[in-house]
Regions:
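Mobile-element integrase/transposase regions
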Residues: 37-104, 128-133, 137-138, 143-145, ...
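Mobile genetic element proteins and their domesticated derivatives, centered on retroelements
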Residues: 4, 19, 39, 43, ...
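Conserved, non-catalytic sequence blocks in retroelement Pol enzymes and Pol-derived host proteins
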Residues: 11-13, 32, 78-80, 95-96, ...
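A short acidic/small-residue loop/turn micro-motif
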Residues: 107-108, 118-125
Length: 255
């Protein structure tokens, strides 16, 4: 139980099935690992089950603008390498001082968060900061083989953001509707951060928010296994190539 408690402390919203697989891998050779149902019952008795807290919703996408909107280039595309498709999105983070907005860029192949930034407004400054962080991790040739996919929000369609993408020779792809399935991997990354961490904590100040997010994103990238990449961490998957093995049939169902 000590290992399970440690993981719960670092990742309070991690699902019981994933937690079981992590602990099983650590202790299976000892011969004292219970079955999944028995393990979940032990979690219940020790008060280690997941409890979801819903929060207020904040609008983060404004598609009512006159900027050019680009076509969706990734319909039915299954990435087979890292840095083939990056997906971008903005979500909110509540603090006692007020809301902050988190800009994320996630690799569609490995699900690794490769760029992020947080700020008090929805200005394009913060998505650009996340983009520049991601770009710092690749060379020019890799950038020219990359697709950047996002919703049609004004930040991603803005002249400043599009200019950076074009300067690096990156192909621009955007959703064609408000259907979250058109940007499912980005939505899933947002959802994991919120339901497994942010909904379960109180962040006192906006200044504290960045340090908290840095710790969470590091755990997400290096320690949280994903069913969409064969129960590997994003960091491990980011060093691979070839189609990833999923642990279920529907790519949008889980993460």
């Amino acid at each position: 139980m000590e290992k399970a408690q440690d993981y719960r402390q670092d990742n309070p919203g991690l699902g019981c099935a994933k937690l079981y697989l992590i602990i099983k891998e650590l202790f299976e050779e000892t011969g004292c690992m219970p079955g999944r149902d028995a393990f979940i019952e032990i979690l219940r008795k020790h008060g280690l089950m997941v409890h979801i807290r819903r929060r207020k919703h904040y609008k983060t996408t404004d598609s009512n603008h006159n900027y050019r909107k680009y076509p969706n280039l990734i319909v039915d595309l299954i990435p087979t390498r890292p840095n083939e498709v990056w997906v971008a999105d903005i979500t909110y983070v509540e603090t006692t001082e007020g809301v902050c907005y988190l800009s994320l860029i996630t690799d569609a192949y490995s699900h690794k968060i490769v760029g992020w930034a947080v700020g008090p407004t929805l200005e394009t400054t913060y998505p650009l900061e996340a983009l520049n962080m991601a770009l710092a991790s690749i060379d020019d040739e890799t950038a020219r083989r990359l697709i950047h996919h996002s919703d049609r929000g004004c930040q991603y369609c803005s002249a400043a953001y599009v200019e950076v993408l074009k300067q690096h020779g990156i192909s621009i792809s955007m959703t064609q509707s408000g259907d979250p399935l058109e940007n499912a991997i980005a939505e899933r990354a947002n959802g994991i951060l919120k339901t497994e961490w942010l909904y379960k904590m109180t962040i006192a100040t906006r200044a504290e928010c960045k340090a908290v997010l840095e710790r969470i994103i590091n755990f997400y990238n290096t320690r949280r296994p994903h069913m969409s990449i064969g129960m590997q961490t994003p960091e491990v998957a980011h060093g691979q190539s070839g189609e990833q093995r999923r642990c279920w049939k529907n790519n949008y169902a889980m993460g």
